Amino acid sequence: MGKIIELNEALANQIAAGEVVERPASVVKELVENSIDAGSSKIIINVEEAGLRLIEVIDNGLGLEKEDVALALRRHATSKIKDSADLFRIRTLGFRGEALPSIASVSQMTIETSNAQEEAGTKLIAKGGTIETLEPLAKRLGTKISVANLFYNTPARLKYIKSLQAELSHITDIINRLSLAHPEISFTLVNEGKEFLKTAGNGDLRQVIAAIYGIGTAKKMREINGSDLDFELTGYVSLPELTRANRNYITILINGRFIKNFLLNRAILEGYGNRLMVGRFPFAVLSIKIDPKLADVNVHPTKQEVRLSKERELMTLISKAIDETLSEGVLIPEALENLQGRAKEKGTVSVQTELPLQNNPLYYDNVRQDFFVREEAIFEINKNDNSDSLTEQNSTDYTVNQPETGSVSEKITDRTVESSNEFTDRTPKNSVSNFGVDFDNIEKLSQQSTFPQLEYLAQLHATYLLCQSKEGLYLVDQHAAQERIKYEYWKDKIGEVSMEQQILLAPYLFTLPKNDFIVLAEKKDLLHEAGVFLEEYGENQFILREHPIWLKETEIEKSINEMIDIILSSKEFSLKKYRHDLAAMVACKSSIKANHPLDAESARALLRELSTCKNPYSCAHGRPTIVHFSGDDIQKMFRRIQETHRSKAASWKDFE
């Protein structure tokens, strides 16, 4: 007798659940995606005990016909595809027919649904995947699915469930991503009877960003657009000053589906270039529309991994769109705003999921470029004397931070600074800026980008240049400023100019592992672009007999090792990236440092040269070169002007 048997359907569904239903958030994702596919305009999600006791999803979608309700719990039963050709033109979020039977096999499920064409609805009750009740129900609009006692029959799965707060954070993250993917749908997330999140469903993505991350974040987001023959890109990206220490705040959407893609993440960072600090990541919401034939979503049961055709072309489109958007505006960060932001970060609570995120009454007016409050919201606030402030919604990835507070009269506007690139001061021949480079060849600042006309005042701590304009006080980091100037020179000149060499009295030896020695021996000509000439010497060794004059002798060993790391660190070598990294290092090593006194003429020359840069606002490593204190900021610090003490409700009326 043969040993191979066909597993019964209940056992097969439990095995499939191991891939599809990893945690309560997985159930929420699958059920809400079904509601989206059903054409719902309003979806309510109720959870208790972080989804372990109850997950309830209610929508106003098309609903199921009576004969389809029981069939929906059969494996690979779906209305989304009909034949193999449909696999290559998938436009829905679900299509595998695995979610409902997998969820039902590890829970107690109730489905209440009705279709517009039928006179009555249908109610189904299943336990462990086995249907116990199938009966008529009073007609309702859409579908309500309740999942109770998740993993009740697979206790081993409960062992690996983290804290309720952590599981709730995962659920919140899922709803955040789906809300960003579908701003045209109103999402409501309720935990233990408390409303966590509510979006308006009016199609305004920027308002959804404000509802999830707060108005302060939405104020610093810029719209991006781009398209070619295959892709259409829309969305928002944050200004370089708004960053986080991880990629969790980047949302990439393909045809309304949230995906994870390392290469597209890298394209976003390449679009920012050196505007970002090392190890910092922006906020971004990118929605990409693509012909379904160019995207294969049938890769993983969770459908978050997608294989893309023409991925390189899409990366180029993303990088270009972000770079063009950020190049259009003035990127000088407000000094006081940054200090206040750091203070808030220090006061952040890691987990605070019990705080409800209240309904956001704001809407964003694209014509007036501002947030405003609806009349009904003002009416509700005026009824409640205690409503003196608006709590912003600050739901984040895996943590829920303390909510920010702020008046809705604060506007989301781009700061404009009257500026000029004209400096009338002459530069002395021996000034710090004349270090043997012809800066007349540096490209002028784009007309779309502006730099303030600065009057030099003094040097602070031999490190910062104090300047003023009619817009207020400016602080310029002298090292970052000259690093930017030199970087923009070297990035175009690396490999094209001969560099003077200084003979070393005692040569340097560099010993490498064998595998690295082989790679570097093949690519050591790349070091010639920086004026570094290594020769093979002995077993797994290179010798350096001379060095370029731009490289100080005390920094030779460290700098050469950094160059070698640049070459060896990337499996997919990019000459463009190598030249960028090399130019950034050369610029940094050869620039004036902190605690270096400058005379007034040298300082003015440095400011003049900074104003001619393509991107004068940050150094090659993403640190700001200049910060701004507005006149109002200074007067507030000395309390020469005061904040008004009228209620927020009064100020809202002014902005109707």
Curated annotation (Swiss-Prot):
User: Does this UniProt record's set of keywords contain DNA repair?
Assistant: yes
Query: What InterPro entries does this protein map onto?
Result: DNA_mismatch_repair_CS, DNA_mismatch_repair_MutL, DNA_mismatch_S5_2-like, HATPase_C_sf, MutL/Mlh/PMS, MutL/Mlh/Pms-like, MutL_C, MutL_C_dimsub
Q: Does the keyword DNA damage apply?
A: yes
Q: Name one GO molecular function term.
A: mismatched DNA binding
One Pfam assignment:
DNA_mis_repair
Name the keywords, alphabetized: DNA damage, DNA repair
- What are the annotated GO cellular component locations? mismatch repair complex
Q: Which GO terms describe its biological process?
A: mismatch repair
Where are the compositionally biased (Polar residues) regions? 387-408
Q: Where is this region: Disordered?
A: 385-408
Question: So which domain of life are we looking at?
Answer: Bacteria
So what family is this one in? Answer: Belongs to the DNA mismatch repair MutL/HexB family.
What function does this protein fulfil? This protein is involved in the repair of mismatches in DNA. It is required for dam-dependent methyl-directed DNA mismatch repair. May act as a 'molecular matchmaker', a protein that promotes the formation of a stable complex between two or more DNA-binding proteins in an ATP-dependent manner without itself being part of a final effector complex.
This protein's name: DNA mismatch repair protein MutL
